[in-house]
């Protein structure tokens, strides 16, 4: 299982990457593996303000439907529209082309509360 060291993580298996003033968010390799083949992704709307811990969309796989939670509070400035036609990108490349959304105006305290890759690895053990 792949676990990039330059990302931050949540115990709910989301990842967060700082990207020049904004934050890109997706689900981890562990999460996509647990879900199985992803067939549909419900995304939030650009312009929405999301609150840490709130459900902001869902991911449907052949096994189940799971809510996707905001790992930090912020404003949605982009969603990965490619996932509408190719949701399986989350399975094949969860940390790159399978990203889900991008936030700005993020609460710094929320970012500081995220887990390092080493701490997230302990959650998985």
Swiss-Prot record:
Domain Lipoyl-binding: 22-104
Biological process, per Gene Ontology: glycine decarboxylation via glycine cleavage system
Cellular component aspect of the GO annotation: cytosol; glycine cleavage complex
Positions bearing N6-lipoyllysine: 63
InterPro entries for this protein: 2-oxoA_DH_lipoyl-BS (IPR003016), Biotin_lipoyl (IPR000089), GCV_H (IPR002930), GCV_H/Fam206 (IPR033753), GCV_H_sub (IPR017453), Single_hybrid_motif (IPR011053)
Cofactor: (R)-lipoate
Keyword field contains Lyase: no
Keywords: Lipoyl
Zinc among keywords: no
Superkingdom to which the source organism belongs: Bacteria
PROSITE patterns, per database record: BIOTINYL_LIPOYL, LIPOYL
Record note on cofactor: Binds 1 lipoyl cofactor covalently.
CDD domains (UniProt xref): GCS_H (cd06848)
HAMAP family: GcvH (MF_00272)
Entry's family note: Belongs to the GcvH family.
PANTHER family xref list: GLYCINE CLEAVAGE SYSTEM H PROTEIN, GLYCINE CLEAVAGE SYSTEM H PROTEIN-RELATED
Role noted for this protein: The glycine cleavage system catalyzes the degradation of glycine. The H protein shuttles the methylamine group of glycine from the P protein to the T protein. Is also involved in protein lipoylation via its role as an octanoyl/lipoyl carrier protein intermediate.
Complex formation: The glycine cleavage system is composed of four proteins: P, T, L and H.
Stated name of the protein: Glycine cleavage system H protein
